[in-house]
């Protein structure tokens, strides 16, 4: 029995399912989840001392690679001054200034401790600002595990094969209107019917929780136009795309400006951080300035601020995102070539340093139905073959993959060699 198998058996005694986030349980791909004990650069090492090229990156935050020395040094330095104060710090202001400089739509920002907190708070703020109750989200998009957003969500819920979560009251769900992603005509029709009741539209500008689905041409622009027409707050959930698709996020990459944005993952540099922000006239409705309440004991935690500030400064260097995107493109081109050579139906998607892998004969992946039409069983086999070859992919056919600046030619060769063997075995 492997060390991971032993640890997983022990974990299930007191942790539901043996994991603290459902997708980690390997239910979608089968087998025993790997328990990791070390991570450095582009690699993670499991409890049995096997090393893998990592394309999960802690589900997105590790854009610099694991254990970047500058980030570790910043955290060590802060450790000497204390773990948490529950009071304002200079670093919070530095972080707010930097985020607002990088993302021009962010005129004011509030720090929280997770992406879920960020999206939950942004929606409450939009409701308080507009005085309206309903929200629009998109099928397959995941915005955290708050009650009103677990309606036809993506991510772990797609992995489990259920459209929503038990425990969500119907009274909550009735205010959440769900439309097809990349279908601007459906948005226009809905807003023409009930726009006066809609507080906000929340969208992942790149749908990264039903694998990786970029926006169709005109979709984001159409959302902006429709929100302006009906007085609806447009929220970009950039927890995944922020600082990754481009330094300024998907809104910079696609040239569409939201009213509010949410960020997470990279902003914490591996520590638990999220934030939401946007137009000053909206943000001034947050307590203590306004009537919309939001608070958090660990919001702006100094250790997290130290890690996040260092990360954002490092990724701000000229050429960083071009290098990240180039590696990702070479990776996907190499995978496609090897799948084609093996006669395996396969298509990839990309947005900067995030990507999607689909076992599908479709020309492109644009809609939720396109995602669901891919062969999850073939992915399951591919996942385990790649794992045997020393490559760790997301353990679900419905999760995006991530590259880091630590991935280089050696990691690319190892990955493509493993993929060539895996595709051959799938014939």
Swiss-Prot record:
Modified residue annotations for N6-(pyridoxal phosphate)lysine: 265
Any single GO CC term annotated in Swiss-Prot or TrEMBL for this entry: cytoplasm
InterPro entries, per database record: 4pyrrol_synth_GluAld_NH2Trfase, Aminotrans_3, Aminotrans_3_PPA_site, PyrdxlP-dep_Trfase, PyrdxlP-dep_Trfase_major, PyrdxlP-dep_Trfase_small
Stored PROSITE patterns: AA_TRANSFER_CLASS_3
Subcellular location: Cytoplasm
Main localization of the protein described in the UniProt heading: cytoplasm
PANTHER family in alphabetical order: GLUTAMATE-1-SEMIALDEHYDE 2,1-AMINOMUTASE, GLUTAMATE-1-SEMIALDEHYDE 2,1-AMINOMUTASE 1, CHLOROPLASTIC-RELATED
Name of this chain's protein: Glutamate-1-semialdehyde 2,1-aminomutase
Organism this protein belongs to: Pseudomonas fluorescens (strain SBW25)
């Amino acid at each position: 029995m492997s060390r991971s198998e032993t640890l997983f058996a022990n974990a299930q005694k007191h942790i539901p399912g043996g994991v603290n986030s459902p997708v980690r349980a390997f239910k979608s791909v089968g087998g025993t989840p790997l328990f990791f004990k070390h991570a450095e650069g582009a690699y993670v090492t499991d409890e049995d001392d096997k090393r893998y090229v990592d394309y999960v990156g802690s589900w997105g935050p590790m854009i610099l690679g694991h254990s970047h020395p500058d980030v570790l040094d910043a955290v060590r330095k802060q450790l000497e001054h204390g773990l948490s104060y529950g009071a304002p710090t200079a670093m919070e202001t530095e972080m707010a200034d930097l985020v607002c400089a990088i993302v021009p739509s962010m005129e004011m920002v509030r720090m929280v401790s997770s992406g879920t907190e960020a999206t939950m708070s942004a929606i409450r703020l939009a409701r308080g600002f507009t005085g309206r109750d309903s929200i629009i989200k998109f099928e397959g998009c995941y915005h955290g595990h708050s009650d009103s957003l677990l309606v036809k969500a993506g991510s772990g819920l797609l992995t489990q094969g259920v459209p929503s979560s038990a425990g969500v009251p119907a009274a909550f769900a009735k205010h959440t209107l769900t439309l097809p992603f990349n279908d601007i005509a459906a948005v226009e029709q809905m807003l023409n019917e009930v726009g006066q009741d809609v507080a906000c539209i929340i969208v992942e500008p790149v749908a990264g929780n039903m694998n990786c689905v970029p926006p169709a041409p005109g979709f984001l622009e159409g959302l902006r136009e429709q929100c302006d027409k009906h007085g609806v707050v447009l929220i970009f959930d950039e927890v995944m795309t922020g600082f990754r698709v481009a330094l300024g996020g998907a809104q910079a990459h696609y040239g569409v400006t939201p009213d509010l944005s949410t960020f997470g993952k990279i902003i914490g540099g591996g520590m638990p951080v999220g934030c939401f922000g946007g137009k000053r006239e909206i943000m001034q409705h947050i307590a203590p300035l306004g009537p919309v309440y939001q608070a958090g004991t660990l919001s702006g935690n100094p250790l997290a601020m130290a890690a996040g500030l260092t990360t954002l400064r490092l990724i701000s260097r000229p050429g960083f995102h071009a290098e990240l995107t180039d590696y990702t493109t070479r990776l996907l081109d190499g995978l496609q070539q090897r799948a084609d050579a093996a006669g395996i139906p396969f298509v990839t998607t990309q947005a900067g340093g995030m990507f999607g892998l689909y076992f599908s004969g479709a020309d492109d992946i644009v809609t939720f139905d396109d995602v669901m039409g891919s062969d999850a069983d073939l992915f399951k086999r591919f996942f385990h073959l790649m794992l045997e070859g020393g490559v760790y992919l997301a353990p679900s056919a419905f999760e995006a993959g991530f590259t880091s600046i630590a991935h280089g030619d050696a990691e690319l060769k190892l990955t493509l060699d493993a993929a060539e063997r895996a595709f051959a075995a799938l014939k």
